[in-house]
From Swiss-Prot:
Name of the protein in its database record: Cleavage and polyadenylation specificity factor subunit 4
Protein keywords: Metal-binding, mRNA processing, Nucleus, Phosphoprotein, Repeat, RNA-binding, Zinc, Zinc-finger
Originating gene: CPSF4
InterPro entries: CPSF4/Yth1, Znf-CCCH_3, Znf_CCCH, Znf_CCCH_sf, Znf_CCHC, Znf_CCHC_sf
One GO term (biological process): mRNA processing
GO cellular component, one term: mRNA cleavage and polyadenylation specificity factor complex
Organism of this sequence: Bos taurus (Bovine)
């Protein structure tokens, strides 16, 4: 009715201008105060707020998808710098630990999300391709679908909204499993008497090796021969004095 009599879209009251320009808004007495009940700062959204941490309005940056669990208890000290959402939104609550760990939660009024474990299971790329060697023991989900005949022929007019399956014959990167290569078995080589004699002589020479005589041992502490370093009585700096 008021639009028929006279349009007031071009009229702006002083109160609306004061709210938009934040006239009369006093800065906070100290930074880090709880501003969860305050409005969003319009100047910060335009990168034009000069009050910084003393601004009485909320500074929201980026897309925050999870509610801050410390803010729910009134214990979050980060304020606007918190990377989580300071807003009670049931769709953005963190996942319930007890339901995800044990499959049940005794709290009838649990504020956290109860996500069905089956919804977390990913589809098996091998089964979607046509065959999975793990069968029912596969840790991924095997979903039975009816293949679209038009897509197999070459073109489906329904596109992504088709109720039948459009198979994808390529596998995602990082999920391909290559079967182990068969080990190349070599026939055992026959040892001739000459080879056996050489091996026996090598084993006997290796077994006959013992500690070297003291005349060939040089002490690295004093530089003299005739004893090991752990038996040296002249100290570890004896080679500097030339003793």
């Amino acid at each position: 009715m008021q639009e028929i009599i006279a349009s007031v879209d071009h009229i702006k009251f002083d109160l609306e201008i004061a709210v938009e320009q934040q006239l009369g808004a006093q800065p906070l007495p100290f930074p880090g105060m709880d501003k969860s009940g305050a409005a969003v700062c319009e100047f910060f959204l335009k990168a034009a707020c000069g009050k910084g941490g003393m601004c009485p309005f909320r500074h929201i940056s980026g897309e925050k998808t999870v509610v801050c669990k410390h803010w729910l208890r009134g214990l979050c000290k980060k304020g606007d710098q918190c990377e989580f959402l300071h807003e009670y939104d049931m769709t953005k609550m963190p996942e319930c630990y007890f339901y995800s760990k044990f499959g049940e939660c005794s709290n009838k009024e649990c504020p956290f999300l109860h996500i069905d474990p089956e919804s977390k299971i990913k589809d098996c790329p091998w089964y979607d391709r046509g065959f999975c060697k793990h069968g029912p023991l596969c840790r991924h989900r095997h979903t039975r679908r009816v293949i679209c005949v038009n897509y197999l022929v070459g073109f489906c007019p329904e596109g992504p909204s088709c109720k039948f399956m459009h198979p994808r014959f390529e596998l995602p990167m990082g999920t391909t499993e290559q079967p182990p290569l068969p080990q190349q078995t070599q026939p055992p080589t026959k040892r001739t008497p000459q080879v056996i004699g050489v091996m026996q002589s090598q084993n006997s020479s290796a077994g006959s090796r013992g500690p070297r005589p003291l005349e060939q041992v040089t002490c690295y502490k004093c530089g003299e021969k005739g004893h090991y370093a752990n038996r040296c009585t002249k100290g570890h700096l004896a080679f500097l004095s030339g003793q």
